Amino acid sequence: MPMVDIDWLKDHVEVPEGLTYEQLAKDLVKVGLEEEEIHTSQVTGPIVVGYVVDATPEPQKNGKIINWCHVDVGDEYNETDENGNKVPRGIICGAPNMAAGEKVVVTLPGAVLPGDFKIEPRKTYGHISNGMCASERELGLGDNHDGIILLRKYGFTPEEYEKLQPGDDAMHLLHLDQPLLEINITPDRGYAFSYRGVAREYHHSTGAVYTDPATALGKKAPVTQGLPEGVKSDIEVIVDDKNPIHGVVGCDRYYARAVRGFDPASHTPNWMRRRLIRAGMRSISLAVDVTNYVMLDLGQPMHAYDLDKIEGPIVVRRANEGEKLTTLDGKDHDLSVEDLLITDSPNGERGSRVLGIAGVMGGLYGEVTAETKNILLESAHFDQVSIARSARRHKIPSEASRRFERGVDDQLQPAAAQMAAELLVKYGNGEPSEHPTDYNTVCNRRPILFKASEVARVAGLDTDMNTISDILTDIGCTVAGGGNGEFSVTPPSWRPDLNEPCDLVEEVARLVGYDEIPVTVPPAPVEGKVGLTAEQLRKRQVADELAEYGMVETLSYPFVGDEDYKNFALDADATKKVSVEIANPLAGDRPFLRRDIILTLAQTVQRNLRRGVENVSLYEIGHVYLWDPNAPAIPALPGAVKPTDEQLAALDAGLPDQPMHVAGILTGNAVDSGWMGDRRAVDWSDAVEAVQRISDRIGAKLTLDQPKAEDVPAQWHPGRAARVMAGDTFVGMVGELHPHVNEALGFPAHSAAFELNLTALFATLSGKPVQAKPISTFPPVKQDLAFTVSTDVTAAELEKTIVEAAGNSLESIDLFDVYTGDQLGEGLKSLAYAVTFRAEDKTLTSEDSEAIRKRIVDAAAKLGAQLRA
């Protein structure tokens, strides 16, 4: 999330003297920018400027060359010789760029660097090293560890460098002693990913004077229309999007401006380098740093190309099947036909060479190098959905894509290019072009018809019309009208999230103050149904029972894709045909809504196991989405009038069925090793126990039906899974997951699971109070019945036969033994049951129990079962 530096913020808004980061966080949270963390420095001094008096190379036996240096760190920190004179400190340094005459950053004994690395005098390579000359990485300023920091090359002007004296405080010089505020930005407020946006919000919170930097920059940007005859723009730009996502062309504005005669040896100024590093970015080169700086300051992602390597026209198009790209980070990517690309046209072949994935990351060809003298600045506006999908598809969450997918100001491009050009001129001696190219098909924003009364109706705020108008104007809206309490409001270009009246109500409430919204308790109804519905009560009972069983409730995103289908061995093509596809998925690799909760719950279990959590047992209650390909098409509703009942009914008929399910996954140990005994791993019986607990809690009568192995769904173990039945209604599955599922997800062996359709289960319940069965006072009759039966007959089938034959006199039945062996013969097994008979109105005689026994034996014989002696 964005870092906020008060010194940088001052460029755009008046900040009171002595403003603390704690107070800044309080001011910003008032307008919805939450504090994530205030980062304090991990570095403590003393850290000072040092002057290298001499550096003597000393070859070592291992081939390494170290430098024995004497570094002047000022009288306060220099060593004292035997005569009481101040002399430079002796320091060992292995950096290849160490040289006499340089000014460096010296960490002295007592200093602490990131990672709790303490600097102390130590004997090494035959010398006492009394300090350390530091690199960027060691100070937490960046990733560069190729050598120590040479202040001469660190972006200081000659005058600033000359003023640096041995012993000067480098903590303050490099801003190592300053904290930073990290803020949390919601996805709809992408404009706050810039200092321009944060400064505007600080103005809204405090009333401080704010100056939009884009206004002046936009006025200075050269005109792109009506160029004199014979004068060409910097480069031709063509947008040729033949595969737009949802009909939205991927690029509606592309602004290109050249800067020629750039000095590639120019260094990034110290102030810019410092700001970039504090924002969490590496300083690479002046040209790249300028584009990153403009992005952080204004919010417009930019890219710099080597103009001499590019051949026009630039073509913005979708990728072709089979195209590949190596991005700036050196990784190879197989491109999708949905990827929007920036290409050029070598040898007149239009759009034949890929320069980068638009709005995500550039490719290796055309990048700015240490030899680049002519630069082409790209400042564009891309479709949010297209960029988001590409970034997720290729797993490149770049700073540019984070901004584009949240929405970038579509009028900012000339101003951003102007700012970048000015910086390249000032610090790189370049010459900006006055003939940029501006491909612009941006449409004007649609005005929103807004009733002032909506603020009171929706937010409960008693706000007068003038205040509402002032607030909307202050956030950048153009407000017209006001008669009859209605406004015509045109949102600003940097707020693509403002599209409906409710969005404007939210803005008014946010800036008036959420603390001003009155707290009211809705009155409870005095007539009709009060409290939770029967379904809500049962859902709560299910959740309580599983929690009491020791499972933890979770809530997962309901999105699935090819990887999930593969993990559970599902037929992806067949499943997709009956699944709901999302028009704008959060993740491009999971564009479908789940048909089973277990698929998304498995993602959560997997994440916990990968983070070292053991014995994970989670459950989730939520909806699944069952698409019917034969359902009628969902009609388009009128936008200006209230839909009719018939239209709403047609809309409802086209929606997928959305039953409520509960699913659970149990992994690891059911019982850990201890003084009471050895560990017991989770197995199918633990999942069955969970289902039985649910059944008992809600008063349902659930039975298990073990299907034949070939009929078991692919994700379940063929011999350790059962269908859960409520009478004749199938309501779910329970058992162990298939070994291939455990292997694919990294689950422990024998991991168990269950999933029940609660909507179907609740429908089988009467809703009437559970009637307790009277306890009989007559004695029971207990018998053991052992049957020899074919191995094809399941224990559940035989048990069902016994129950039906015994009738109401049967009180309980338990399978207590399964035996196979040579004594029985091939293809046979023995199933032994303990049964209890009891009558409600009399004592069972021996004749009664014998009659029951005979009915059972006769019924079992129909399955080929014989009673063993």
Name each region found by the language model.
Residues 1-229, 258, 351, 376, ...:
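Phosphate-backbone binding interfaces of nucleic-acid-interacting proteins
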Residues 3, 23, 473-480, 619, ...:
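A carboxyl-terminal module marker
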Residues 3-6, 12, 24-26, 41, ...:
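Glycine/proline-enriched, intrinsically flexible loops and inter-domain linkers
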Residues 43-46, 219-221, 294-296, 490, ...:
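Beta-rich nucleic-acid/ligand-interaction surfaces
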Residues 49-91, 166, 273-274, 278, ...:
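Conserved mixed alpha/beta core segments that line enzyme active sites in large multi-domain catalysts
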Residues 122, 315-368, 523-658, 720, ...:
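Class II aminoacyl-tRNA synthetase-like tRNA-binding/catalytic domains
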Residues 128-150, 160, 171, 175-179, ...:
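Mobile "lid/hinge" segments at catalytic clefts and subdomain interfaces of large enzymes
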Residues 197, 448-616, 836-838, 843-844, ...:
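Extended, well-folded interaction surfaces typified by the phenylalanyl-tRNA synthetase beta subunit core
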